[in-house]
């Protein structure tokens, strides 16, 4: 699971921090002033790092932090995350996502189940009333079966899978 989480977080990183080096600065490369006779130190181009407006030496460059991870390892990580939640008794399967659209009723249902930070995985057809009710509840995340991932499962205390999403999850793991 740790490898899969590290892979997910590395893929998520942007890595778009960048500065201009002396070759990227738009400035003349001609000598600033003559070598001798001025009383000043000798200098060449004005684009070097010690001058204002010059390029930075050894600064951050644009690069990707992502790395490869085999599909079998990713699938194994997802299996172990789901089985871990099941062993701890933190996996709940709901038969439907029927809801009247009121946040208070859904919150009361969740409190009756005794769940705190929760991830809800829905099937292909998510009821709009359920989404409306779930959007306003703190510590409740709603994911489609397509977006199921190890990091979100591990991050939340409880996992609720709606019955129509269960077959898609089983299909993905087989």
Question: Which positions does each model-derived feature cover?
Answer:
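A generic structural signal for short, solvent-exposed coil/turn residues
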Residues: 17, 24, 50, 85-86
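Residue-level detector of alpha-helical recognition elements and their boundaries
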Residues: 16-20, 40, 47, 93, ...
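A short, flexible low-complexity segment enriched in Lys/Arg and Gly/Pro that occurs
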Residues: 1-36
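Extended polybasic, low-complexity segments that bind anionic RNA or targeting/receptor surfaces
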Residues: 1-14, 60-174
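Charge-rich, low-complexity amphipathic helices
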Residues: 23-31, 47, 100, 132, ...
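Glycine/serine-rich anion-binding loops at beta->alpha junctions
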Residues: 25-59
């Amino acid at each position: 699971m740790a490898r899969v989480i590290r892979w997910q977080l590395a893929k998520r990183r942007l890595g778009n921090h960048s500065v201009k080096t002396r070759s990227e600065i738009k400035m003349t490369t001609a000598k600033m002033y003559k070598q001798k006779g001025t009383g000043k130190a000798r200098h060449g181009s004005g684009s070097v790092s010690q001058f204002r407006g010059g390029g930075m030496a050894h600064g951050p460059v644009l690069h990707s932090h992502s790395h490869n991870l085999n599909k079998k390892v990713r699938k194994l990580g997802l299996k172990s995350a789901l089985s871990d939640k099941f062993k701890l008794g933190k996996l709940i399967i709901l038969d439907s996502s029927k809801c009247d659209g009121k946040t208070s009723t859904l919150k009361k249902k969740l409190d009756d189940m005794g769940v705190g930070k929760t991830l809800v995985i829905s099937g292909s057809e998510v009821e709009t009333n359920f989404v409306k009710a779930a959007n306003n509840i703190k510590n409740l995340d709603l994911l489609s079966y397509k977006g199921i991932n190890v990091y979100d499962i591990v991050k939340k205390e409880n996992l609720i899978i709606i019955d129509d999403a269960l077959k898609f999850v089983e299909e993905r793991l087989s």
